[in-house]
Amino acid sequence: VEFTTPDKPEIKTEATVNGEKEVDPLEEVTIIDTVSYSGLVPGKPYKISGILMDKSTREKLLVDGKEVTAEVEFTPENATGSVEIPFTFNASTLAGKSIVVFETLYQEDVEVFVHADINDKSQTITIRGLGGLVIKKTAEDNFVEGISFLITGKDYSKKFKTDKNGEIRVEGLAPGEYTVTEISDKVTARYE
């Protein structure tokens, strides 16, 4: 009599955002976690639950005070295959953070495999940091204080005035293209 034992369930994963490992700190970001599995029993229901972790703190990532989780239920046709788990969240306050996806595979509510490696590069997404810029106004008569500039970009429009050195320093800008326009007002009217 021969006995065959089923393969032990395993999962391997790859997390990306539009195929990339880095993303801008946007209000809506969707990480797609592609979970490749093997050793599952065809025709049996499974569930994969995932949670996002903050790599620097090694704690569950909180966005607006809530954990970011997702789960997918599926019934495999074959012992091997893959499923995608989408995690959609607001990343606008997460600039500079690295996020790691952890998953747990369940069969009929019984945990059968856990993938929870905080250092797994295939599971890590980096939120790009914010940038800044410096504007330096020059003039032949050295009159550079109080000159107005408008900086505009995607979802951004703000007016600034130069300091006594003719400079404006702007921090906290999301990556992207910006337009800097000198504005004519009563201070700059002397140049017209």
Across the structure, where does each feature detected by a protein language model lie?
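Solvent-exposed loop/turn and edge beta-strand elements of beta-rich ligand-binding domains
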Residues: 1-192
